């Protein structure tokens, strides 16, 4: 879910997609930390290659070049190590490395930078995003966690929209929460179609990643009726 309110990250932290009950305390030694990290990295590759249902513990231990005994030192099941994979991966999606945009810059520039960072991180984690969709379809508890996390981002973006409205930089007649839900949902589905199911690969010409950034940014800006940078001193919406 795209985050256009980076400055508000701490106000409503999204819940983890990893079930806390499945996460053990990390090892206390450097060697233990390295071994656990290697297992998690190997598990991610196996899950992405085989899918959650078909992945086996023996596939993970072979990929990590370790024994079953070593695996059970750190994890008790496939569910446990999948939770560890999510714990690591979600940090990349939560903090995708958005380039700095000064607070006084126009809102469109902030939205564009946020969209670019989100889509870049989504592409980097495309295989995992497809895997999450698979798990959500078979695991009600995980689906609920994922929905709660998405809702936190929707609320965060809604606060950002409300701030723009208060500054006269967005259409004041829009309901911030409903608008955020619509635009955030659009972003996640477009990203899933472009990077996971590759729905647009039959189109001519092919949509590039930068095309996607520009298109979704224009949709955000137009939907919110954000004025262009050279008209920031004017209200976003004027009576006719």
Q: Where are the regions a protein language model picked out?
A:
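Helical hydrophobic small-molecule/effector-binding pocket
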Residues: 87, 91, 108-133, 152-159, ...
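N-terminal intrinsically disordered/low-complexity leader segments
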Residues: 1-34, 196-202, 228-240
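Helix-turn-helix
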Residues: 38, 42, 46-80, 84
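Amphipathic, non-transmembrane alpha-helical scaffold segments
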Residues: 32, 40, 82, 86, ...
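Hydrophobic/aromatic-rich alpha-helical bundle segments in the mid-to-C-terminal region
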Residues: 143, 165-217, 227-240
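Short linear capping/connector segments at secondary-structure termini
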Residues: 99-100, 132-140, 200-201, 236-237
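Short secondary-structure transition hinges
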Residues: 126-156, 177-178, 205-206
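Hydrophobic alpha-helical connector segments
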Residues: 84, 98-127, 176-183, 213, ...
């Amino acid at each position: 879910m795209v985050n256009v309110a980076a400055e508000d990250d701490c106000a409503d932290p999204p819940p983890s997609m990893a079930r806390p009950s499945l996460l053990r305390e990390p090892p206390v030694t450097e060697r233990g930390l390295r071994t656990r990290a290697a297992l998690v990295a190997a598990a991610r590759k196996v899950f992405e290659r085989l899918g959650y249902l078909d992945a086996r513990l023996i596939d993970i231990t072979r990929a990590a070049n370790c024994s079953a005994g070593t695996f059970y030192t750190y994890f008790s099941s496939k569910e446990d190590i999948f939770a560890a994979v999510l714990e690591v991966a979600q940090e990349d999606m939560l903090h995708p490395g958005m380039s700095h945009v000064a607070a006084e810059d126009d809102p469109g520039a902030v939205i564009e930078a946020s969209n670019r960072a989100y889509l870049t991180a989504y592409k980097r984690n495309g295989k995992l995003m497809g895997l999450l969709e698979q798990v959500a379809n078979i695991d009600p508890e995980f689906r609920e966690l994922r929905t709660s996390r998405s809702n936190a981002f929707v609320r965060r973006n809604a606060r950002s929209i409300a701030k723009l409205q208060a500054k006269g930089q967005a259409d004041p007649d829009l309901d911030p929460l409903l608008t955020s839900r619509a635009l955030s949902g659009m972003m996640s589905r477009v990203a899933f179609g472009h990077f996971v199911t590759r729905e647009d690969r039959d189109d001519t010409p092919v949509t590039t990643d930068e095309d996607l950034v520009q298109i979704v940014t224009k949709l955000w800006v137009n939907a919110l009726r954000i004025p262009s940078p050279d008209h920031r001193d004017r209200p976003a919406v004027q009576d006719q």
